[in-house]
Amino acid sequence: MKIRYWLLAMSFIFLSCGRVADDVEANYGIIPMPNELAPMQGVYVLQGKKTVAVPSGEAAMKVFHYLEDALKNTSVTLKGISETGKADICLSIDNSLPNEAYTLEVSSDRINISSNETAAGFFYGVQSLLQLMPAAIYDGDRKYEGKIRIPAVSITDAPRFP
């Protein structure tokens, strides 16, 4: 009889452990969890030389340099341009978004981060983008030479608390 209870308890423990792993995969590992996250089909591969459309203004330029610095330990080279149509990564201004809000769209051929003209929204969008990348790019001891595979996703987020 004791063996039956012991087996039942152990089964419960093993089955409950599997759900935690599923939940971690479902949220894409972004902390804090965005208000809206819609997984999409495909993967964006970040490697080699990429262009980044940077709107005029100090806020977007600071965030561009932050992204450039975050990827310095990889083989990716970023070049800032002003033409949005030809860019691999596009920072764009959307004044319909509230302060500090952003949208992040990752498709198989492009990354787009939109925010109003404040640096905070662009910064939060870049933070979410960086969290979608493999942790190995942050290893300061050696350069990450592999392809950076970013899952396709659509995110809309804004601060929950004023």
Where are these regions (language model features)?
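Positively charged n-region of N-terminal signal peptides that target proteins for export
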Residues: 1-5
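Acidic, contiguous N-terminal accessory segments
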Residues: 17-161
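Bacterial N-terminal signal peptides
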Residues: 7-14
